[in-house]
A protein has these predicted regions:
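A hydrophobic, multi-pass inner-membrane permease signature
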Residues: 2-306
Length: 306
């Protein structure tokens, strides 16, 4: 007689009251984070006169493209500046990750005799800073890099905190036995780093890379100090100049009527400001969901211990 099998359905795990409360507060927090972004998008397409009289609102009565058109009027220069910003972001992030990961790998090796001295050298800029004036004198007077795109990449290429995160990840998340096995097989330090360590660092490289890319994308101070050519202006510097030109027009009482007519009968101030914000944060918002899991995993695994 065959034995009868009794299938027991697994009980569904019920969510406790605490999980519902946590979900409610997380949803509320998400709403608070998304609300300013939504308001910015709406305000960019709201009539500027309504913004000045009624203030910012989620439900405007009059819509207008004047603010966005005022920014997009710099179409050719806007495209050039977008290209400069993308180039600086991609190249700077790639070079920075390569240099910092090699630096972090060296500091994580117990047999490396100079690691303590280099660790102190790494911490000095974090504790003592020479200031912007000394950096300006060195870059322009010693290295003669005035109006060079290298000055958009080098000053923020390597940071102490990112090196510490990468070093901690190597020490705590990559088994030492893998590197010992590679050395037994005859692999040198370069081969061990590029073929074993670097591929295993993908989560934290993605996290640090996203933070670096965001820093490069939002940087305008270095361009403001060092860049003079319009063909080398990044996006943020161009948008600042657009905003200043609008403020200059608003403060000038002798504006030709042809200029006002070309801008739709009035000079948009707040709607143009919101339009510049959209142009800046748009690519970052689009890119973040693709890096979110690496961002969280890389930071939690690489920086909790150590």
């Amino acid at each position: 007689m065959a034995k009868e099998q009794i299938l027991v359905k697994p009980k569904k795990k019920k969510n406790g009251v605490g999980q519902y409360i946590l979900g409610f507060f997380l949803a509320l927090y998400t709403l608070f984070c998304a609300a300013p972004v939504v308001l910015t998008v709406i305000s960019a397409f709201t009539d500027d006169k309504e913004l000045k009289t009624s203030g910012f609102t989620y439900f405007p009565q009059h819509w207008s493209m004047a603010g966005m058109n005022a920014v997009l009027r710099y179409g050719k220069q806007l495209g050039t500046s977008y290209g400069v910003t993308i180039f600086v972001t991609v190249v700077g992030t790639f070079v920075g990750l390569l240099v910092m990961s090699m630096f972090a790998y060296s500091l994580s090796r117990p047999q490396f005799r100079m690691r303590y001295g280099l660790s102190i050298y790494l911490l000095i800029p974090m504790l003592f800073n020479g200031g912007q004036l000394s950096s300006y004198v060195i870059f322009t007077g010693v290295y003669h890099l005035k109006d060079s795109m290298l000055l958009l990449i080098l000053p923020i290429c390597v940071t102490t905190m990112n090196v510490i995160i990468l070093r901690t990840y190597i020490q705590n998340s990559i088994p030492e036995e893998l590197m010992d096995a590679a050395r037994i097989d005859g692999a040198g330090e370069y081969r061990t780093f590029f073929q074993i360590t670097l591929p295993l660092m993908k989560p934290t490289l993605a996290a640090v890379g996203f933070m670096m890319a965001t820093t490069y994308w939002n940087d305008w101070q270095n361009a403001y100090l060092y860049i003079e050519s319009k063909s080398k202006q990044p996006l943020q510097l161009l948008l600042i100049k657009i905003q200043k030109s609008i403020e200059t027009l608003l403060s000038n009482k002798n504006i030709p009527s042809a200029v006002i007519a070309a801008m739709g009968g009035s000079i948009p101030q707040w709607s143009a400001t919101m339009a510049t914000v959209i142009i800046v944060i748009g690519p970052v918002i689009i890119a973040y969901p693709f890096f979110q899991k690496y961002f969280v995993k890389g930071l939690t695994v690489g920086s909790v211990k150590g």
